[in-house]
Regions:
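N-terminal amphipathic alpha-helix/helix-capping segment at the start of soluble metabolic enzymes
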Residues: 1-2
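Aromatic-lined carbohydrate-binding surfaces of glycoside hydrolases
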Residues: 5-218
Length: 218
């Protein structure tokens, strides 16, 4: 099947389910056969019960959305971020240890507003980081029956600045190695769920890892 996809952003702001369904109806009418749901960290799961209900969806709600899309014969693809673009997660004290920064405005490049002072990048050198995201992504994906999952991995401009990551650099790894390692971790996670991994390609311009990646990443 040739994928003709449109994406709706549910990660940066919460939309009403009625609006999402109308968006899906219009997408189908306009000839799209695939809906990419950009979720980031916007679903309340077993590992994220602390998420603000006013700003996130329950598993029941995301299942209703996925079921509606798939019930129309369309493909629903969940899209995540588990490296950068996770500032909404890191604002919670329960997830503070997953960040590279305690205060990005002091320790990083100073891009972050007060609300997101821990920044947008997680520490992939912290073993709890991928443990958390593996559980989160796996639970959310359980309500999607298509073969694809989008792992994001874009715009990782500010990483490997914390003590854990700097220790890896001092030991001989490069930032390219750290990025490649996270891509491959996500690839194995997708495989474990029986899904094909999608990702954004912008950071191949900075870290030339394309030739080293499995050919079935899209």
């Amino acid at each position: 099947m040739k994928i003709v996809a449109v994406q709706i952003d549910l990660g940066r702001q919460k939309e009403k389910i009625e609006f999402i369904k109308s968006f899906v109806d219009n997408a189908e009418k306009w000839g799209y056969n695939t809906i990419i749901l950009y979720l980031e960290c916007s679903i309340r799961t077993k590992v994220t019960p602390f998420f603000d209900e006013d700003d996130t969806y329950s598993m029941t709600e995301i299942k209703e959305i996925a079921d509606y899309i798939e019930g129309k014969g369309l493909l629903a693809i969940p899209a995540f971020e588990n490296f950068y673009h996770i500032e909404k997660l890191l604002q919670y004290k329960e997830a503070a240890s997953l960040s590279e920064f305690k205060d990005e405005r002091i320790e990083g490049r100073g891009w972050s507003p007060e609300r997101f002072k821990r920044g947008s990048v997680g520490c992939t050198s912290n073993p709890d980081f991928n443990k958390f995201f593996d559980a989160y992504i796996t639970e959310v994906c359980s309500v999607f029956h298509g073969k694809y999952v989008h792992m994001g991995l874009d715009e990782v401009f500010e990483f490997a600045e914390c003590p854990r990551c700097k220790a890896r650099l001092k030991a001989g790894e490069t930032k390219k190695d750290i990025f490649f390692s996270q891509v491959m971790h996500d690839y194995e996670l997708a495989k474990s769920m029986g899904k094909t991994m999608l990702m954004w390609d912008d950071f191949f311009e900075y870290y030339d890892i394309l030739a080293e990646l499995p050919r079935d990443i899209i």
